Amino acid sequence: MSSKPRIHILGTGGTIANITGNYISAADFVPIDALLDLAPEEVTSHAELSLTEVTHLNSGALTPEVWFDLQNEIMQRSSSNNPPDGFVITHGSNTSEETAYFLNLVLKTEIPVVVTAAQRNIGKLGTEGFKNLYDA
């Protein structure tokens, strides 16, 4: 049995998953599995990771429907026979606090949920996205 924590990452897009510097279409964002493929090994090797791509949008385009999708995904996985030790949501920084507040109100789980974001996209020198993902 592995001693690594089992973390489920839910991708929603945002700057942390943006590679082009444009925020016009879904093509400007990389899916969560591709984001982790680009990440340094230190980011992905300290935990057993599983992934769900919820959406990949600019956070200003996220709607309450996406919030409910996140809630449903987290609650379904939390109540499974083998729930993760924690959840990490990759998100755009513009509206991450709204999503976090909504989830704080509606989630009925003791499993930690962390929302993380970035100010510089992964295509830029000095991006903090991978460090933020690691810290989450």
Language model features with spans:
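Active-site histidine-anchored catalytic micro-motif
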Residues: 1-135
